[in-house]
């Protein structure tokens, strides 16, 4: 028997990838990540070393997901990583974050690797501020925070 098979042959059906092993069709499956309706071959890395600002940044200008967050803070006070569901850099203090993560002080940090990515339906944007409030615009110091993401 041949590899691959068609559904509704002759009627414009779809072809599915398979492997013929001893006359039995075993499906071939490609593992891909991404939000519903999107598939790619893996995550894209992103790195940010904080500037002396709120670090308002657009990571991805379309729907996506974050599959890994690694944050490290050398400052003596907590810093706050804020995620926004938008296709451009946030207006910090005006836009409302959808996720706020405290980054522990004094050379501490965290690693978050969810079993399923954190989905953003519009885009992936972020900021890093000195206080937790949604309207906070406290800039962090240069090199306070090192952030790495993996996104799709």
Language-model features and meaning:
Residues 67-69, 117-135:
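Noncatalytic modules at the cell exterior or secretory-pathway interfaces
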Residues 73, 85, 128-130:
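Residues on the solvent-exposed faces and adjacent turns
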Residues 75-95:
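Short, surface-exposed beta-strand/strand-loop-strand elements in extracellular ectodomains
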Residues 86-89, 134-135, 150-152:
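A generic "folded-domain core" signal
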Residues 108-116:
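Exposed aromatic-hydrophobic patches
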């Amino acid at each position: 028997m041949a590899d691959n098979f068609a559904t509704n042959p002759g009627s414009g059906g779809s072809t599915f990838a398979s492997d013929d092993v001893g006359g039995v069709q075993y499906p071939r499956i490609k593992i891909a990540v991404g939000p519903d309706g999107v598939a790619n071959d893996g995550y894209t890395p992103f790195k940010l070393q904080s500037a002396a600002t709120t670090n308002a940044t657009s990571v991805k200008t379309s729907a996506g997901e974050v599959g890994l967050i690694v944050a490290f803070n050398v400052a003596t006070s907590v810093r706050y990583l804020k995620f926004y569901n938008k296709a451009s850099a946030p207006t910090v203090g005006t836009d409302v974050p959808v996720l706020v993560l405290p980054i522990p002080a004094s050379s501490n940090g965290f690693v978050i690797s969810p079993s399923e990515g954190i989905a953003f339906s519009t885009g992936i944007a972020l900021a890093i501020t000195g206080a937790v409030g949604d309207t906070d615009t406290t800039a962090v110091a240069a090199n306070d925070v090192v952030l790495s993401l993996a996104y799709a």
